[in-house]
Amino acid sequence: MSNEFNAQSFLRTVSSSAGVYRMYDVKNDVIYVGKAKDLKKRLTSYFRKNLANVKTQALVSHIHHIDVTLTHSETDALLLENDYIKQYMPKYNVLLRDDKSYPYILLSQHEHPRLAYHRGPQREKGHYFGPYPNGGAVRESLHLMQKLFPIRQCDDLYYKSRSRPCLQYQISRCSAPCVGKVSNADYDEQVKLASLFLKGKDQQVISALVDKMELAAERQAYEQAARFRDQIMALRKVAEQQEVSNNKGDMDVIGVHYSSGIACFHLLFIREGKIFGSRSYYPSVPAQTDMDEVLRSFILQFYLNADIQRTIPKEVVISHNFEELHELEAAISEALDKKFSIKTNVRADRASFLRLAVTNATNAVVTRLSHKNTVEQRFVLLEEILELSTPIQRMECFDISHTMGESTVASCVVFNREGPHKGEYRRYNIEGITPGDDYAAMKQAVSRRFDKIEAGGKIPDILFIDGGLGQLRIAQKIVDEKFVHLDKAPQLIGVAKGEGRKPGLETLILGDTETSFSLEGDSPALHLIQHIRDESHRFAITGHRNRRQKTRNTSTLESIPGIGPKRRKALLQHLGGLQEVKGASVAELVKVPGISIEMAQTIHDALRG
């Protein structure tokens, strides 16, 4: 325990009321947030002579001072604790980093409703189906919906501009309501069936289609009956592949596995009795944290994160019981202003779903541990090769990407001892250099990365430069300048491509001595270097391609007199892209808002050359 903190003196001032406490280190950073029904009793437990928990010992050794906030009840304390954890992100708390909003399928309110991918605030009027675990699940579902129901998925601007059916109509993925190829009644019927399907009422949809097929057959409308038959067969095939519960309610099913410091919470999103998707979460867990705290922290942070646009069900099923479960139920119910229950002992369909979730969580942890051990071994070997006295905690790698000097982008990727740390990746749009000057691009990127570096900042132990001696020298010079007043600086290593750019033939160059050496092609340490180099290249080229496409779209249209950012955006949105604008007739261009007949002719002439 720090000599600067007098625990006995502090504890004499602490109330026995409910409340929240914040522990600070010598740098005045919050290192732990906790809550208690009895603050005096809880805080006293930290300063016993024999602390069994290693994590608690480490925490107490760093305490400089403690602040407490009294609350009216334990429920209030839980809510305030969650707010403080989100605000301070303390290093000794279990932290759930889940800042992405969840995607939905939107069925819009329109004369001819559309199905669309939606993420973010639900401002547009319509029905939202979800949440889905990720964007890929939504896109897969929309692709399936196109096969089952001929409902438009184009945006309203594109819909308004059509004078003839698009390709989706030709391949039977849309009924072309934009040009009157389907009656409003028939289109509305398909929208109704699609809505029922998204709610999980597959059998109701199939029954309705069977009735329609039989009615069409009685009227001898055999072509229409055949279309209904094909739709029924497609729906039955989909229904057979989906796991559905007899319980038609909404719930989240959470399987948990915690081993060797890695916790996985695998969630099944059950909506209307159907699995909408699943997603694994890996909260950051300080060493030696007990299972109860991991469970409590996850549930509290996941269901009280108001920044995320997520539909929260009334029921959550979880694989493990834990202390304070009922207190959490009450706190979350109060915060959400609706009934919220957490169940652990379940049977029938719920038990089946729970077994599935636990199996996935267990497999995920086993896989991650295997990967972690492999990466750890590679780090250890690299440390031995470089004869380092301290373990490598952070590595970064820079790469430059451009096409003949156009739209140059630099990437900086970050690896820690668990592999890629994608939240720390950065891209730099390179400006003001001679096109194709890789040395100048590297100089600008490294300068921007370390422009305001401080002793307490994120300093890599190893900094790889994807390039030869010239680029390495540029980077080394910048690092020497930026770190001249600091005790620590990164070790720079150039990764020069081998003969024929073949993997395994790379030459490594130390930045400080310019000594060159190579590793065996099957060396795990080389595989680690190749991994971070390849990841840096991938991240750079993706950024370059995006920037290049944006630049080309912008420059092609904005070079036309009278076309500014607003008109360019209107043209691209209305017609669907640059190629569509280039292929549009004057009559089609005039339909774009803000484009006159004279302007349309100018655009047409400029793009047709």
Swiss-Prot record:
One of its GO terms (molecular function) is DNA binding. The keyword tRNA processing does not apply. It holds the Pfam family UvrC_RNaseH_dom. CDD domains: GIY-YIG_UvrC_Cho (cd10434). The keyword Cytoplasm applies. Its main location: cytoplasm. It is found in: Cytoplasm. Residues 16-94 form the GIY-YIG domain. GO terms for cellular component: cytoplasm; excinuclease repair complex. Residues 203-238 form the UVR domain. The UvrABC repair system catalyzes the recognition and processing of DNA lesions. UvrC both incises the 5' and 3' sides of the lesion. The N-terminal half is responsible for the 3' incision and the C-terminal half is responsible for the 5' incision. Belongs to the UvrC family. This is UvrABC system protein C. It comes from Shewanella baltica (strain OS195).
